[in-house]
A protein has these predicted regions:
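A Zn2+-metalloprotease active-site environment signal
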Residues: 2-17, 24-277
């Protein structure tokens, strides 16, 4: 009986090695953007194609628009839409400093009438702004540019594609552990540890990169990059307490504001140059 158990363990380890090898073979190391003035240089590991993620994002975006339109919650305020689209246009024009190919994306910008304080930019340039963000924060144009620049940066860096790839990688240790031990409890524990060790740190890196690129996009587009600091102060006041940095996919409010102050100083000359044009 003991011999049979060892046999299964050996087979599980062999299968686990094959799974890991297969996953790694499907990944590639890429640099999705130029470094810019802020110096974003991290290599990224991708296991799925841009085309797959872009197609899925476009489909999801279409469904969101259809649902919002059905509920009469899409682009309700014409003046608000014009304001948002105007800022988006200026920001998108600056994406060439990080990704020349982004000018060929099918950019779209829409406003969802909702109390949510939220915004996003899906892969391929599908932007969504919630009216609650504008109304509850009494947001200025500079602050709105900070939000949108941050979200556009996620798309430029293809963070969704990277996260999907990392989630694929994160499943492997738990699966191997379940095969080797036959224990679902241990498999769940393995996935939890993998999440904290692999997925969360990468997510914080993604947020930092989005802050870096976002403030530069805003500055180059003629928006005061220092508005990112006041924006996150407002967000922190509105949101109340936040989870500790170790267990969050976002940097803590205090450390984020410090980083934004440093980044704003780096790109402030770009803002001053843009105002002279």
């Amino acid at each position: 009986m003991q011999q049979r158990k060892n046999s299964w363990t050996g087979a599980g380890q062999w299968l686990g090695a094959l799974l890991v090898a297969g996953l790694l073979a499907g990944c590639q190391t890429v640099q999705t953007t130029g470094a810019g003035q802020v110096g974003v240089t991290r290599n990224q590991y991708m296991g799925v194609s841009s085309a797959e993620v872009d197609a899925a994002s476009a489909q999801s975006y279409r469904k969101m628009l259809q649902e919002a339109e059905r509920k009469k919650e899409l682009n309700v305020d014409a003046a608000m839409l014009a304001r948002v689209q105007g800022i988006a246009k200026r920001l998108v024009a600056q994406t060439t400093h990080f990704r020349p190919d982004a000018q060929g994306w099918r950019w779209e910008t829409n406003v969802f009438h909702s109390d949510q304080v939220n915004a996003f930019c899906m892969a391929g340039g599908k932007i969504g702004i919630y009216s609650g963000l504008i109304e509850k924060l009494k947001i200025t144009d500079d602050e709105l540019a900070a939000v949108m620049g941050h979200e556009i940066a996620h798309a430029l860096r293809e963070h969704v594609r990277e996260q999907v790839s990392l989630q694929q990688a994160a499943r492997v240790p738990g699966l191997v552990l379940a095969i080797v031990t036959g224990s679902q409890v241990l498999a769940d524990l393995g996935n939890m540890v993998t999440d904290v060790s692999l997925t969360l740190p990468r997510s914080r890196e993604a947020e930092t990169e989005a802050d870096q690129i976002g403030v530069e996009l805003a500055a180059r587009a003629g928006y005061d990059p220092r508005a990112a600091i006041s924006l996150w102060q407002k967000m922190n006041q509105l949101g109340g307490g936040r989870p500790p940095e170790f267990l969050s996919t976002h940097p803590s409010p205090d450390s984020r504001q410090q980083d934004l102050a440093r980044l704003s100083a780096v790109v402030l000359p770009l803002y001053e140059q843009s105002r002279k044009r």
